């Protein structure tokens, strides 16, 4: 019994605290995020404008992550996280008082920027609380609990809208939940001592870049960044366009396409810890390759098939490939936690790349879809193959 207890990954108090934070934030944030497009529509925002605002959300999140990766190293990840959560708790309240589309849209862009502030600090806290001998398993579980929280939050939001038809109720609950998450972080997430004077001027930034180059991490960062772009590029495209593809090409109901998105969350939530465990066993180098192969072959299958049963099986396999890829990215990224001078910048770069994929994906795919509806998954396959080529060209130099 004692051995089983030691083997249970959440026995570690610090890592358990991080996972509870991610679960609480996932629930609270997801009470707000899925209903925002509907809220925009309810106050008169045009569909095309909603798409532009969502892309700008991704852009603002992208641009904030690199500088706040450096800020996180300078002032401490816990302080950065507390400031971001405090600001984020005010955002849902702001929507209650947003009586014009301009105010609401601007607030959503600011929301993306605040999330960008929090992302590098979140990576940093994870990197210093996980068990380095079970790195993949820890990062997989951390991703899974956030996804689980997202599913719970989305279900709460759906219930509120269907039962009470009240955006304000959902926003108030989201604000309260984020504020409680802030209190939890203040109490339960440990603070680490910050080494002053490391990266507070231009010369020290140069030192950071020199250390990245000197340690041979450039190629590894390129692989992680391109993989991060790919993951959110394809996910954002599927979320944005799967409803239209289902109606126009597959001739299915929105109920089916909504279920596909829910299945993605379910697959990711259940498979992420397993994917992390597998990466610990076989190594990230092999898992990257197997994930790319599975994703590319399944995207090819999605281009060809119009049979609903086959389409469903193939897209679930694709989701598995994406989950395993994400597990390897998170596992490799957490390794930079051992390098205090460079970790903030690296977390910011990879996080910004992820946000860039989320911002650019729907825009590019919308043009492709408008040109030819049957080319949606072909466009995604091309991007996936390009990232695979980058990996194959650089993995020997990348120290993965």
What does each of the following model-derived ranges do?
Residues 1-12, 192-224:
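Juxtamembrane intracellular "pre-TM" segments in multi-pass secondary transporters
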Residues 169-186, 377-392:
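Symmetry-related core transmembrane helices of the 12-TM Major Facilitator Superfamily/SLC fold
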Residues 35-48, 240-255:
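Short amphipathic helix-loop junctions that connect adjacent transmembrane helices
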Residues 109-146:
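Cytoplasmic helix-loop-helix junction between adjacent transmembrane helices
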